[in-house]
């Protein structure tokens, strides 16, 4: 009874002393607080620190008293070091050889454990440039020196069938084969990695690429043109992507694409479908001319890149190669009109339909009320002499190829607005304005003698009056 009472008194003493010390200042408060802190610190501890375990030396840090053994590469790489003198059978361990000698009735003995402390052995790497060739960095295990030599200086003969990794030690290959393919790190882009470090490196690059693409959204205009049959065929060259900027379409009042907007093309769209009308919807297996459609003065900002000097002189329409066939003579799909449609809008810029048989497409396009007036007005700033030189070259090329002279049976309704007469500079075909243009761009003769007959009676001094 008294013992339990003493225990309760001892357990409650610190609390009582602390509360008394906190009650207020007094002559004995400091001594009581110091005694309470001493009792708290003197609580018995039952845990005793265990003695440190003896650990073996780390690889490359041998015991200074160990015996240093240097083996040759041939000895290290030998699979069977211990040979039987009777049958020349080899064994990896001496104990196995001794057990084998029993079968030959030869004296044998196994190593017996002695009470004497055995001196440890360390092994040097035979490669002079290796760090373990130094006795201070020798390896303390015969199997360890063998694996080290195979891994660092030997041939990797073991190959994984799943990931094609090669190993020099068979145990390493077996350990890898058990885990190969079980751990997969899959990136959002679809790439699969078996190693985490490779996955982290790839993921950092992949995320950076996604962020860069999100900050700079661009339209791959070359890819869009290539999807329609090739960029060069439709007139997209090196400077096309820079010329097709937003300033050329919506913000530049002097842009050469003003007639397209007036003809019904919506050029103020979002970036995703801004170039929808300029991408061909159907491919043409026949290669077209390599020049772009139109080119005017440099201040009009058109999409023109020429590689022939003819474009610099004519300024409006680029002639193709003389070896091209009839329907690829001009890259004039801008003025194209289909035979099975009565729509009056301007067709696709780069579509080369099957019904545009050569120069007749130029006639139909230029005489249509929806395209000729707009195009002529827009190109009113071009030099009138360029237009004259253009028509002269057209006639010369046509005469060389033996094509129909009706190509030049043209009549511009807005020629008066350009400061000229009611016809072009020279009536080099003797037509005298005999063309009637319908609304849908289908032109025809309104009467009079055939064109061939008129050309026979044309002015004899005219350079293009002869058939």
UniProtKB/Swiss-Prot annotation:
It holds the Pfam family zf-C2H2. GO terms for biological process: asymmetric cell division; root development. The modification Phosphoserine is found at residue 72. It comes from the Eukaryota. PROSITE patterns: ZINC_FINGER_C2H2_1, ZINC_FINGER_C2H2_2. Keywords: Chloroplast, DNA-binding, Metal-binding, Phosphoprotein, Plastid, Repeat, Transcription, Transcription regulation, Transit peptide, Zinc, Zinc-finger. A zinc finger (C2H2-type) spans 82-104, 123-153, 158-181. GO terms for molecular function: DNA-binding transcription factor activity; transcription cis-regulatory region binding; zinc ion binding. A zinc finger (CCHC-type) spans 185-208. Residues 1-20 form a transit peptide. Residues 38-65, 440-467 are annotated as: Disordered. InterPro entries: C2CH-3rd_BIRD-IDD (IPR055187), C2CH-4th_BIRD-IDD (IPR055185), C2H2-2nd_BIRD-IDD (IPR055186), IDD1-16 (IPR031140), Znf_C2H2_sf (IPR036236), Znf_C2H2_type (IPR013087). This is Protein indeterminate-domain 6, chloroplastic. It comes from Arabidopsis thaliana (Mouse-ear cress).
């Amino acid at each position: 009874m008294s013992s339990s009472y003493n225990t309760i008194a001892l357990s409650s003493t610190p609390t009582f002393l602390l509360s008394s010390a906190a009650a207020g200042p007094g002559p004995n408060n400091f001594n009581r607080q110091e005694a309470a802190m001493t009792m708290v610190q003197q609580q018995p501890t039952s845990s005793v620190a265990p003695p440190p375990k003896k650990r073996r030396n780390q690889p490359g840090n041998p015991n200074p008293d160990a015996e240093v053994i240097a083996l040759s590469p041939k000895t290290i790489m030998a699979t069977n070091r211990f040979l039987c003198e009777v049958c020349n059978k080899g064994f990896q361990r001496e104990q196995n050889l001794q057990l084998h000698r029993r079968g030959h009735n030869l004296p044998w003995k196994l190593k017996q454990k002695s009470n004497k402390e055995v001196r440890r052995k360390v092994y040097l790497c035979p490669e002079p440039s290796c760090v373990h060739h130094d006795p201070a960095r020798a390896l303390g295990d015969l199997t360890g020196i063998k694996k080290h030599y195979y891994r660092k200086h030997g041939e990797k003969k073991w190959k994984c069938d799943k990931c094609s990794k090669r190993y020099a030690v068979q145990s390493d290959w077996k350990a890898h084969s058990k885990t190969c393919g079980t751990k997969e790190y899959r990136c959002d882009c679809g790439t699969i990695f078996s190693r985490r470090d490779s996955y982290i490196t790839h993921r950092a690059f992949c995320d950076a690429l996604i962020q860069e693409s999100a900050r700079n959204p661009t339209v791959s205009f070359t890819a869009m043109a290539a999807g329609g049959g090739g960029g060069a065929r439709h007139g997209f060259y090196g400077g096309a992507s820079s010329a097709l900027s937003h300033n050329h379409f919506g913000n530049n009042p002097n842009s050469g694409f003003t007639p397209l907007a007036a003809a019904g093309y919506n050029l103020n769209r979002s970036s995703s479908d801004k170039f929808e009308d300029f991408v061909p919807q159907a491919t043409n297996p026949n290669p077209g001319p390599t020049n772009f459609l139109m080119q005017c003065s440099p201040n009009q900002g058109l999409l023109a890149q020429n590689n022939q000097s003819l474009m610099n002189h004519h300024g409006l329409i680029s002639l193709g190669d003389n070896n091209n066939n009839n329907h690829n003579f001009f890259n004039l799909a801008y003025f194209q009109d289909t035979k099975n449609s009565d729509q009056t809008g301007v067709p696709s810029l780069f579509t080369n339909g099957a019904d545009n048989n050569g120069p007749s497409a130029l006639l139909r396009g230029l005489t249509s009320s929806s395209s000729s007036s707009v195009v002529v007005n827009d190109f009113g700033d071009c030099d009138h002499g360029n237009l004259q030189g253009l028509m002269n070259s057209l006639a010369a090329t046509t005469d060389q190829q033996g094509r129909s002279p009706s190509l030049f049976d043209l009549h511009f309704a807005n020629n008066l607005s350009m400061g000229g007469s009611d016809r072009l500079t020279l009536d080099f075909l003797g037509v005298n304005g005999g063309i009637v243009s319908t609304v849908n761009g289908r032109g025809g003769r309104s009467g009079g003698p055939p064109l061939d007959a008129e050309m026979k009676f044309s002015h004899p001094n005219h350079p293009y009056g002869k058939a």
